[in-house]
């Protein structure tokens, strides 16, 4: 229905060097928003965006999902429509941070004992003892380790 606006999201996104996945996400989020609000984009207000996010919140969406939609709306309003955005009227949701579950010493020992490959055993031990993520261990270089201080 408003395909020219959806196409403009792609054009502006490319100019701003957004990744193709981000552009597609923005387009899909704005399509959902326009279907929900059922107004011409030139008539949109921040209250419309707020109503949409409240609707999604009432459908028990997570804060990260709401913030994803909010980001698409901000981009659409400011960059595509050239409208002002009121962060006070349409605030970002506060993330629900989950406390990570930490393995017990016996669970770590069982993991290491169950890993026959010495390389992976060393990686798991390093991840656990230094609190590193998988990507941090994978990208670790020889020069990242201070052998005199025994520190990473």
Regions found by a protein language model. Name each.
Residues 1-152:
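Conserved catalytic core of the tyrosine transesterase superfamily
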């Amino acid at each position: 229905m408003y395909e020219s606006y959806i196409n403009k999201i792609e054009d502006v996104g490319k100019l701003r060097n957004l990744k193709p996945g981000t552009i597609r996400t923005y387009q899909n989020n704005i399509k959902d928003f326009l279907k929900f609000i059922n107004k011409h984009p030139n008539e949109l207000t921040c209250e419309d965006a707020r109503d949409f996010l409240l609707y999604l919140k009432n459908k028990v969406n997570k804060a990260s999902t709401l913030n994803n939609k909010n980001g698409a709306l901000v981009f659409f309003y400011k960059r595509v429509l050239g409208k002002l955005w009121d962060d006070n009227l349409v605030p970002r949701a506060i993330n629900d941070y989950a406390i990570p579950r930490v393995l017990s010493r016996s669970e770590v020992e069982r993991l290491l004992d169950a890993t026959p490959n010495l390389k992976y055993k060393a990686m798991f031990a390093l991840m656990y003892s230094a609190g590193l993520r998988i990507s941090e261990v994978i990208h670790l270089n020889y020069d990242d380790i201070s052998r005199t201080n025994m520190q990473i």
